[in-house]
Curated annotation (Swiss-Prot):
Keywords: Host cell membrane, Host membrane, Membrane, Viral matrix protein, Virion. It comes from Lake Victoria marburgvirus (strain Popp-67) (MARV). It is a peripheral membrane protein. This is Membrane-associated protein VP24. Pfam families: Filo_VP24 (PF06389). The keyword rRNA-binding does not apply. It is found in: Virion membrane; Host cell membrane; Host endomembrane system. May act as a minor matrix protein that plays a role in assembly of viral nucleocapsid and virion budding. Unlike Ebola VP24, mVP24 has no measurable impact of host dendritic cell function. Belongs to the filoviridae membrane-associated protein VP24 family. The keyword Membrane applies. One of its GO terms (molecular function) is structural constituent of virion. Monomer or homotetramer (Potential). Interacts with nucleoprotein.
Length: 253
């Protein structure tokens, strides 16, 4: 399907505000405790992350679940019935979301080589590490991550959030509820549920016998509350309410 694009829009004139942007903020992950959760700063984003859903995820992973929630356990059996699955904190699930948002830009857009290299390094760092910073040569940042490129990068992340809000909550009407991406050695699935977005990362192994790729039983997953991303999204203003998109009482999360 043909899509509208601003690929060849000329960059706006550099203003006082854009000159003062902290380009190094994309290479720093600042996490601070807050009341009931955490505050995360990355790029020009400030995320307020509640500790929502952690207790529920751990309860669903236990064997003491009310009958009404068994359907949820069965649907996500590779998460809740799998002894090799691990629950991660919401701020780590958010970090994975941001890494995927950058990877989506890297894979789908015709970026200039130097800028693409920076986007690649940032996405790999967010997806594969938990460190608070990554060192990128100031020369590279100065040449390839200009103020205008920085704004394009941040806008791309917001566009990815917008794409996530077009998903429907897991449903029985055949409407899309997940975004999936396969990277080197791992598959990431982002699924919209009642409470927000369920993020899972599964390792992809190669069978020694035949060289075919198979999904490993080892999986990490976490939940990002909807409100964390909604304040950075421009979706759903004035749109009609679609209950399939917003709520499904058949799932527990």
């Amino acid at each position: 399907m043909a899509e509208l694009s601003t690929r060849y829009n000329l960059p706006a004139n550099v203003t006082e505000k854009s000159i003062n942007l902290d380009l190094n903020s994309t290479a720093r992950w600042i996490k601070e405790p807050s009341v009931g959760g955490w505050t995360v700063k990355w790029g020009n984003f400030v995320f307020h992350i509640p500790n929502t859903g952690m207790a529920l995820l751990h309860h669903l992973k236990s064997n003491f679940v009310v009958p009404e929630w068994q359907q949820t356990r069965n649907l996500f059996s590779h998460l809740f019935k799998n002894p090799k699955s691990t629950i991660i904190e919401p701020f780590l699930a958010l970090r994975i979301l941001l890494g995927v948002a950058l990877k989506d830009q890297e894979l789908q857009q015709s970026l200039i080589p130097g800028f693409r290299s920076i986007v690649h390094m940032l996405s790999e760092w967010l997806l594969l590490e938990v460190t608070s910073a990554i060192h990128i040569s100031p020369n590279l940042l100065g040449i390839y991550l200009t103020s205008d490129m920085f704004k394009i990068l941040m806008a791309g992340v917001k566009n990815f959030f917008n794409k996530m809000f077009t998903l429907h909550v897991v449903n029985d009407h055949g409407k899309p509820s997940s975004i999936e991406i396969k990277l080197t050695g791992q598959q990431i699935i982002i699924t919209r549920v009642n409470m927000g977005f369920l993020v899972e990362v599964r390792r992809i192994d190669i069978e020694p016998c035949c060289g075919e790729t198979v999904l490993s039983e080892s999986v990490v997953f976490g939940l990002v509350a909807e409100a964390v991303l909604r304040e950075h999204s421009q979706m759903e203003k004035g749109q009609p309410l679609d209950l399939t998109q917003y709520m499904n009482s058949k799932i527990a999360i």
